[in-house]
Amino acid sequence: MAKEFKQHTGLAVPLDASHVDTDAIIPKQFLQKVTRVGFGAHLFHEWRFLDDEGKQPNPDFVLNFPRYQGASILLARENFGCGSSREHAPWALDDYGIRAIIAPSFADIFYGNSLNNQMLPVRLSEEEVDELFKYVEANEGATITVDLEAQTVSANGKTYHFEIDSFRRHCLLNGLDNIGLTLQHEEKIADYESKIPAFLR
């Protein structure tokens, strides 16, 4: 069964960049894996590391700052996840430990892929996202709460509302991926299959 997402409070890391594409999120040389595990080690590889092997962390990249270690909420700017449609991008973010991404806008395919992989992309206005950036950057250890049931983001005593498709919300709240959705109708499927003539089975 997929992971449920109801409410999450976590340390937020501010990635102050617009139009972050999927090749930056997970470069093409790391796409050979056939399972979802292990991509987190290569997340933002070209930015996080100074060498090709990934052994020399770039001290100037925000995800490497000591204050943001263990972050589970990513703040980003507009058009996050643009570029190719590789599903490995949300796999890498999820494997790294990111549970929610907050940005003014997302590339459509990335947005859908994230939801399909039980990671919540939250769209807020540019002004609201900018407020969150300023709060997180000014307060070490700042956390943000994302409440999918209430469709709110809370931080620094303020609450922001976001919209999400009701079907997508239902799937996340109940931990339902495509297989889980199918299994909700398991009895009906079994009943239908039992009525199929033997020569058609």
Curated annotation (Swiss-Prot):
InterPro entries reported in the protein's UniProt record: 3-IsopropMal_deHydase_ssu, Aconitase/3IPM_dehydase_swvl, AconitaseA/IPMdHydase_ssu_swvl, IPMI_Swivel, LeuD
Annotated catalysed reactions: (2R,3S)-3-isopropylmalate = (2S)-2-isopropylmalate
Keyword Protease carried by entry: no
EC number: 4.2.1.33
Single Gene Ontology BP annotation: L-leucine biosynthetic process
UniProt pathway annotation: Amino-acid biosynthesis; L-leucine biosynthesis; L-leucine from 3-methyl-2-oxobutanoate: step 2/4
Signal peptide: none
Gene3D superfamilies xrefs: Aconitase, domain 4 (3.20.19.10)
Enzyme class: lyase
GO annotation, cellular component aspect: 3-isopropylmalate dehydratase complex
Biological role stated in the UniProt entry: Catalyzes the isomerization between 2-isopropylmalate and 3-isopropylmalate, via the formation of 2-isopropylmaleate.
Protein name, entry field: 3-isopropylmalate dehydratase small subunit
Lineage of origin: Bacteria, Pseudomonadati, Pseudomonadota, Gammaproteobacteria, Pasteurellales
